[in-house]
Amino acid sequence: MGEIININITSIIDHIVFILLLALMLIIGVLLKLENISIKDLFKNKEALFIVILVIGLSISSAIFISFMTNIPLKQSIMISSGLGWYSLSVVLNTDFIGEYYGMITFMVDFLREVLVIVMVPLLRRYLSVELVGYAANTAMDFCLPVIRNNYGNKIVPLAITIGLILTIITPALLVLENIIL
């Protein structure tokens, strides 16, 4: 049923999404160049590093709390929260590591994180800025970046890209390590 004229629709959609993400990354690179911001400067951003540590710590702490308040096992709860918005990766890894049921929950948690950022940034922009960029996690540098930029201006773009980039590098390792350790 997923095939039309012997072509897998999922494969085509995956390729289109991949090409769109590459185009978005190219646009981000061009914008950084126009703002005279180097990649080296991004990784020297101490505020971004602090936010990354805070996001990971609070995600894991929340997962521990939720595990004790519900019947979700600790390992599954921590791994669900550690997707950090990257649902195309975390769902696949968590489905392999902790099962299809928790893989689907991972998708919902990561997807809702993205939707909440898109809805909450315009509503709370007067009261919160870097907090919502941190909550966007991996999506701060791609899908949520236009919403963040439109509401907070170009000055916050390097911070958002740095947070997203660092979390994008850390997330796969975090999920694999949690699966091994827990």
Model-predicted regions and their roles:
Residues 6, 70-71, 125, 179:
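Short helix-capping/hinge motifs at transmembrane helix termini and TM-loop junctions
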Residues 30-41, 66, 92, 121-124, ...:
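C-terminal ends of transmembrane helices
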Residues 1-59, 74-85:
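Helical membrane-embedded segments and adjacent short helical loop/helix-boundary regions
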Residues 76-116, 127-162:
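Alpha-helical membrane segments and immediately flanking helix-loop junctions
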Residues 38-64, 103-115, 159-167:
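Entry/N-cap segments of selected transmembrane alpha helices
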Residues 4-8, 14, 124-131, 135:
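Short alpha-helical packing/oligomerization segments
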Residues 173-182:
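Juxtamembrane boundary at the C-terminal end of a transmembrane helix
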Residues 22, 117-118, 144, 172:
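Hydrophobic transmembrane alpha-helices of multi-pass small-molecule transporters
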